[in-house]
Amino acid sequence: MKGVLFDFNGTRFFDSPLHCRAWKRIALEYFHKQLTDEDLDKNVQGRPNNLILSYLSPSTLSEEKRNEIANEKEVRYRKLASSDPAFLHFAPGLTLFLEFLKKNHVPRAIATSSEKSNRAWYRKVFPLLEYFPKEAIVYDDGSFQRGKPDPQIYEVAAKRIHLDPSSCV
């Protein structure tokens, strides 16, 4: 192992319930759809917003409307997270592990499906730049055609720390 690739939402920061709540509200208000737990597991969690919106409304939305709804979802998510400080911390043990990696000069990156609009907010809430170079934080910029579990975003993250994905955990 030469480097470490981290997911973020739902693994290093336990915010999945907040994303699910925001998507459930968006689905109901904009598309009159009630999302089930199965819908969330199969079509929402870990997926970029563009793929989630394609699932909710396959062809009826303009690009402008998709962006508007995606931005609204992220605003709602941040409001939910900010209103409950219980969510605003790293997973137990993560800080110690990050300190160990940093001290031992182990390259590390984050690969997250989070929207670009959340990036500044995460940096305010979490000490990300203390542990990860700015260029090693890979987020959904709209260019990923496939959502997780597809390895595409992890491959990009490995390249950002100048490693082959096979040499990372």
Where are these regions (language model features)?
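Short, well-ordered alpha-helix to beta-strand connector turns
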Residues: 1, 105, 132-135
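Short active-site oxyanion
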Residues: 105-109, 166-168
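Short beta-strand/turn micro-motifs composed of small residues
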Residues: 112
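Substrate-recognition "cap/lid" segment bordering the active-site pocket of phosphatases
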Residues: 87, 115-169
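N-terminal helical cap/lid subdomain that shapes the substrate entry/recognition surface
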Residues: 2-95, 99-100, 104, 117
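A generic structural signal for short coil/turn motifs at secondary-structure boundaries
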Residues: 13, 108, 145-147
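Intrinsically disordered, low-complexity boundary segments flanking structured domains
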Residues: 64, 108, 124-126
